[in-house]
């Protein structure tokens, strides 16, 4: 290989690296040498100037994730923190709109104080067996709650379900023993016959529709009395 060919190859490589770095939102001065780009790459890895979504994770000595911060994400992908039993996340970034299947499956130390206000969808098994999850409310924009979404979340302390909710799937709140009285603020299109299965402490469910308007009552909450408060709006 000639010297000229080698110089051309190096020049092209430098140009490609420069383009890649600048694509992440980090400016590369024209006079920067090839070996001087290392610090700029480190800046990207640390999140500095990055425009792509990224996650900062805290791990313990065994390599288990104990905390995480999500930057720039709108969706938490399926299995994102699957079986992270030491994850003690206290909050999620405000831009999250959907939580995927099995996203926090068996995250037994997860203690979120609230969910992002823009959240619309909680998918299947999203918070399965998150036994420390003690939410007292759900975002007003929630439209669907998937199969086993809050399965055995025994500290869940919801008192109402938002008006925009259209679907509650199978075993969505299975054995959520912290639930005792629930008020529906709107009328879902469908509620599974097992949505509240095992919720032995639910004694009252208040709904703004007439008897029979939503099938499968009492939706698995066998100890509940349903108060129908139909006003003619449905």
Q: Which role fits each region the language model picked out?
A:
Residues 18, 78, 101, 170, ...:
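Short glycine-/small-residue-rich flexible loop motifs, especially phosphate/cofactor-binding loops
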Residues 52-75, 85-98, 108-121, 131-144, ...:
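Structural signature of tandem-repeat unit edges
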Residues 1-2, 191-197:
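Compositionally biased, low-hydrophobicity segments enriched in charged and small polar residues
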Residues 1-63, 75, 181, 204-205:
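Surface-exposed receptor/substrate recognition regions of extracellular proteins
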